């Protein structure tokens, strides 16, 4: 066994010396590959962070920026690497190609998304321009028809007919809005050329909306003119109103004075009634059956009055 092992070692040494190549350890090779993978990931992250959000760049500019950043990262790492690891730099050149390929794929995806967004923006701008033109043309026709309608009908029937028209306008407006939304979805998805149908739907929607707004505004104007309009008064009418107001104020002041006088009289009478000597029965005494006799309301020392005092022994008659 020892002889066979020695023969194999001798053959390997001869092959190395003849070919001029050195033996590479597998452990060192795997470590170098791991380092290369880590550097490739870090370079991709830096390339992603370098591009600011919301800025659209072309495909060529992105490829240039990515290649420059990757080369700088690898140059810095090559200066730091030991001479034993510099043997396998050919693998890093392969990694650079892979990074560039992935970056180009991402840029293609971003460009495709940007193109889709530009197409959608163009469609929306065309629709807005069509709606503006239709609003300008349709508003004049609606105003003419409504003026003739108001001229024929009476003022009393305006409110009821306009309310009925508003309710019908809202009901007709809902299906037109749903049609327009379906047509917009089909245009964005690219399901066919339906520009004529779009124009018709926008015409219906604009006419309904303009009718509802004009009817509302005219109703409000009619109400304001009927209820809120003030009549212009002449100088004579103003003077008459001022005289009426002054007369009313005088009457009020006289009533207040009379009420105050009556209050003072009542207060004085109450004070004077409390000073009388005669015993005035209360309400409770009046209700009792025992208080049948009511004394006269006059003082005892009045002239011409006789008073009888009856005792057990004698009766006394007193005169004043």
Curated annotation (Swiss-Prot):
GO biological process: chromatin remodeling; DNA repair; regulation of DNA-templated transcription
List of residues that carry Phosphoserine: 67, 129
Bias (Basic residues): 42-59, 268-278
One example GO MF annotation: DNA binding
Source organism, top-level taxon: Eukaryota
Ranges of Low complexity composition bias in the record: 207-217
Record-level GO cellular component terms: Ino80 complex; nucleus
Compositionally biased intervals (Acidic residues): 1-12, 22-35, 68-80, 117-130, 161-174
Transmembrane segments: none
Region described as Disordered: spans on this chain: 1-232, 244-306
InterPro entries named among the record's database cross-references: INO80B/Ies2, INO80B_C
Keywords: Chromatin regulator, DNA damage, DNA repair, DNA-binding, Nucleus, Phosphoprotein, Transcription, Transcription regulation
Main subcellular location: nucleus
Compositionally biased residues, Basic and acidic residues: 105-116, 131-147, 244-264
Subcellular location, record wording: Nucleus
Function: Component of the INO80 complex which remodels chromatin by shifting nucleosomes and is involved in DNA repair.
Similarity-based family: Belongs to the IES2 family.
Further information: Present with 1470 molecules/cell in log phase SD medium.
Subunit composition and interactions: Component of the chromatin-remodeling INO80 complex, at least composed of ARP4, ARP5, ARP8, RVB1, RVB2, TAF14, NHP10, IES1, IES3, IES4, IES6, ACT1, IES2, IES5 and INO80.
Protein name per UniProt: Ino eighty subunit 2
Gene for this chain: IES2
């Amino acid at each position: 066994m020892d002889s066979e092992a020695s023969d194999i070692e001798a053959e390997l040494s001869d092959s190395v010396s003849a070919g001029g190549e050195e033996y590479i350890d597998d452990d060192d090779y795997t470590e170098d590959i791991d380092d290369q993978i880590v550097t490739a990931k870090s370079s991709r992250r830096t390339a992603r962070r370098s591009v600011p959000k919301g800025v659209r760049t072309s495909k060529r500019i992105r490829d240039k920026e990515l290649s420059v950043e990757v080369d700088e990262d690898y140059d810095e790492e090559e200066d730091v690497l030991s001479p034993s690891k510099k043997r396998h730099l050919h693998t890093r050149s392969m990694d650079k190609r892979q990074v560039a390929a992935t970056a180009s794929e991402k840029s293609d995806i971003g460009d495709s998304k940007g193109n889709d967004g530009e197409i959608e923006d163009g469609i929306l701008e065309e629709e807005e321009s069509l709606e503006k033109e239709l609003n300008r043309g349709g508003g004049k026709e609606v105003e003419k028809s409504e003026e003739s309608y108001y001229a024929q009908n009476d003022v009393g029937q305006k409110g009821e007919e306009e309310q009925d028209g508003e309710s019908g306008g809202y009901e007709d407006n809902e299906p037109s809005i749903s049609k327009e939304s379906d047509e917009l979805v089909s245009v964005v998805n690219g399901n066919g050329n339906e520009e004529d149908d779009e124009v018709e739907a926008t015409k219906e929607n604009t006419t309904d909306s303009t009718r509802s707004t004009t009817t509302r505004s005219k109703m409000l104007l009619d109400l304001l003119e009927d209820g809120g309009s003030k009549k212009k008064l002449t100088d004579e009418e103003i003077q008459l109103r001022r005289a009426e107001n002054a007369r009313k104020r005088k009457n009020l002041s006289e009533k207040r004075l009379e009420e105050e006088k009556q209050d003072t009289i009542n207060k004085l009478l109450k004070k004077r009634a409390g000073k009388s000597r005669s015993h005035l029965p209360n309400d409770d005494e009046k209700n009792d059956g025992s208080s049948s006799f009511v004394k006269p309301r006059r003082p005892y020392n009045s002239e011409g009055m006789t008073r009888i005092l009856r005792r057990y022994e004698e009766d006394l008659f007193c005169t004043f």
